[in-house]
Amino acid sequence: TAEYNQLKVLKGMQDNKVSDIHFAATTGYGYNDLGRDTLEDVYASVFHAESALVRPQLISGTHALHIALSGNLRPGDELLSPVGKPYDTLEEVIGIRDSVGSLKEYGVSYRQVDLLPDGTFDYENIAKAINEKTKLVTIQRSKGYDPRPTFSVKQIGELIAFVKKIKPEVICMVDNCYGEFVETIEPTDVGADMIVGSLIKNPGGGLAPIGGYIAG
């Protein structure tokens, strides 16, 4: 798996013709920053996505998730988590805990379906939870602080297929933190419209002190 993913990243760099020029400093306002733009093209290639946003200004995975959610949800929309409660750090983003600037404050409602006792998806109640207001379904790949197992890409693909069968136009976003490069495929290979992650974790190789990405 490690060798496969190493080759996949190298191919992404080769396909986008990464060279020494991409590591040169730029001046001005950062317009037409060749290094930055090419890095984002590499991420899009590696994750088999149409495009990607990769920036140090996305200071963490939580920040990247906040941007992704805020960019796709509007007042009156509903966010659904079919895998139970997300990370504690997202509670204030969503509005589970009251916070200034939360999605709830801007009129975005939230609904969640807890996992079954054996840690599998509760498909029956997920189907009931999807309604005309459901705009985005967020799937947290990592178990986080919960005792449940981390989901495989295959499991995520099955869940996405189930959701899309009920409501094809719904946006399926995967919180990919801690999940990058641990399998030979990523959620974008099995139907995810968007994946979000942190450069502090797997993509940064333990070296990046900051950064995040959104690809879809």
Segments and roles (model prediction):
Residues 1-49:
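Glycine-rich phosphate-binding segment of PLP-dependent enzymes
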Residues 44-68:
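Short loop-beta-helix segment that forms the pyridoxal 5′-phosphate
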Residues 37-40, 54-55, 196-198:
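Short secondary-structure boundary micro-motifs
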Residues 9-15, 19-22, 30-31, 59-216:
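Conserved PLP-enzyme active-site core in the AAT-like
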